[in-house]
């Protein structure tokens, strides 16, 4: 089935959102004056994902004293704790122009020096490279520990903020093994993914209705996939998700690949969690339990269907400690990026990042893709377990075809914030634009850009 998606229809396509403001007054006012101070810095970076590391390292290399706060025991966020082993292309959609460099490229080169990354076709709309997620932890450790002016706080979360006037922060309050402590600073970067610092400091945030928030995925690594392929040449792991195989799941698509450096192991992203707002503790808890239930169902279904010699079994060897989270809170910023901005390649005077990843929206029982060249694809699970693919166009062939898009600094700047800037998936953008902007290679650039903005502001002070 082919459908013509006109430009008129495209421009009218949008989604509702819910304004949430900051957190309640008690959370936002968890003040620094009543807790001991753990240090005074030029910059506090909340969130030690790859995005947060890019922000901290960029600032430290330019002479700033930085505190880096991460709730896990290691850096990397989705690239490590969620076992997501993919970064998308650093090139334009035609593969002719490198549009992303900086620390993202440096990280890839460090992984490549040890054979811990595998590059794909630079024009591939899905995958730029696969990397070993454990090796990624070590590379990010190296980047941070090479900078003597970065102080790291692992197993720590931002629980509040202190302001001396509206829009001006003086400290972030964290909770870690040593208790509740304040980190004082001149500037702050929120790289938490969920806009935790911005919300706790009382800045306005918003989020979509729960039913429209993108679906989340728990990833896992499995052993003994090779023997199944050897015996069953037509084996496709996604087939297990179909109703007739008894896994009891509601979708029939996933994504898998050999683990870099250990091709006898396979990464798999085949779970699907909908109607979950990960900024709500109860939602996140139930999502984790449900995702792990789905993993067990997948393992059991494979072992029922496929027998292997020598008593071998399809075996779960590693389970992500975090959900692969796609979306939660967004900040209310000075500018909201739209799908038109992305897919028509709008240029911004305050451009701080470029990207070429397609619009990719995980919704309900399916996925929708929109490409810069005007193509649209939809994939949806049917009641009978089959996947229905439809292709069409969201714009006419006569429209210009950009090969990349730009991200403006204003979309990272919360309204009324004097010394807070954000980086990552809390960017202010429409649901459709977010489908493209949310991927890690884009977020990493936001981290670097946020740090560079802080450096410029401090130099001008």
Task: List the predicted regions and their residue ranges.
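A short, basic/flexible loop-to-alpha-helix module at the beginning of a structural domain
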Residues: 28-39
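Beta1/beta-strand and adjacent pyrophosphate-binding region of the FAD-binding site
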Residues: 38-49
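C-terminal segment of classical bacterial N-terminal signal peptides
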Residues: 21-26
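N-terminal Rossmann-fold NAD(P) dinucleotide-binding loop
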Residues: 52
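N-terminal secretory signal peptides and thylakoid transit peptides that target proteins
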Residues: 1-18
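A short, glycine/Asx- and small/polar-enriched loop/turn
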Residues: 164-170
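Conserved N-terminal/central alpha/beta ligand/cofactor-binding core
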Residues: 13, 58, 64-65, 70-160, ...
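Flavin (FAD/FMN)-binding glycine-rich loop and adjacent Rossmann-like elements that form
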Residues: 155, 171, 175-187, 191-461
């Amino acid at each position: 089935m082919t459908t013509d998606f006109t430009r008129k229809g495209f421009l009218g396509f949008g989604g509702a959102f819910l304004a949430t403001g900051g957190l309640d007054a008690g959370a936002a006012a968890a003040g620094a004056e009543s807790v001991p101070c753990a240090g005074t810095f030029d910059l506090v970076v909340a969130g030690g994902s790859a995005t947060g590391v890019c922000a901290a390292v960029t600032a430290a290399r330019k002479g700033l004293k930085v505190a880096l706060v991460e709730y896990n025991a290691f850096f990397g966020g989705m690239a490590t704790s969620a076992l997501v082993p993919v970064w998308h292309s650093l090139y334009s959609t035609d593969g002719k122009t490198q549009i992303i460099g900086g620390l993202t490229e440096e990280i890839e080169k460090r992984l490549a020096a040890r054979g811990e990354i595998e590059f794909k076709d630079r024009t591939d709309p899905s995958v730029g490279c696969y990397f070993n997620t454990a090796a990624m932890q070590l590379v990010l450790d190296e980047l941070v520990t090479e900078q003597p002016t970065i102080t790291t706080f692992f197993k720590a979360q931002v629980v509040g903020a202190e302001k001396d006037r509206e829009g001006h922060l003086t400290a972030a309050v964290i909770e870690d093994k040593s208790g509740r402590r304040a980190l004082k600073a001149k500037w702050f970067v929120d790289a938490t993914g969920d806009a935790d610092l911005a919300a706790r400091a009382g800045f306005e945030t918003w989020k979509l209705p729960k039913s429209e928030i993108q679906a989340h995925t728990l990833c896992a690594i499995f052993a003994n996939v090779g023997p199944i392929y050897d015996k069953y040449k037509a084996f496709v792991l996604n087939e297990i998700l179909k109703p007739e195989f008894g896994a009891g799941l509601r979708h029939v698509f996933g994504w898998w690949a050999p683990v870099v450096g250990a091709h006898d192991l396979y990464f798999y992203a085949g779970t699907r969690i909908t109607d979950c707002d990960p900024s709500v503790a109860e939602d996140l808890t139930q999502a984790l339990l449900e995702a792990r239930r789905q993993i067990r169902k997948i393992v059991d279904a494979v072992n029922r269907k496929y027998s292997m010699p020598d008593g071998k079994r399809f075996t779960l060897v590693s389970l992500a400690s975090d959900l692969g989270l796609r979306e939660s809170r967004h900040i209310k910023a000075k500018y909201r990026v739209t799908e038109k901005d992305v897919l028509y390649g709008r240029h911004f005077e305050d451009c701080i990042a470029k990207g070429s990843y397609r619009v990719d929206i995980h919704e309900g029982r399916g996925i929708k893709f929109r490409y810069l060249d005007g193509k649209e694809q939809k994939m949806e699970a049917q009641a009978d377990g089959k996947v229905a693919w439809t292709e069409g166009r969201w714009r006419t062939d006569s429209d210009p075809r950009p090969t990349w898009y730009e991200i403006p600094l204003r979309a990272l700047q919360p309204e009324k914030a004097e010394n807070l800037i954000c980086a990552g998936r809390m960017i202010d953008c429409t649901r459709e634009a977010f489908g493209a902007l949310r991927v890690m290679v884009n977020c990493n650039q936001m981290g670097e850009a946020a740090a560079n903005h802080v450096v410029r502001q401090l130099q001008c002070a």
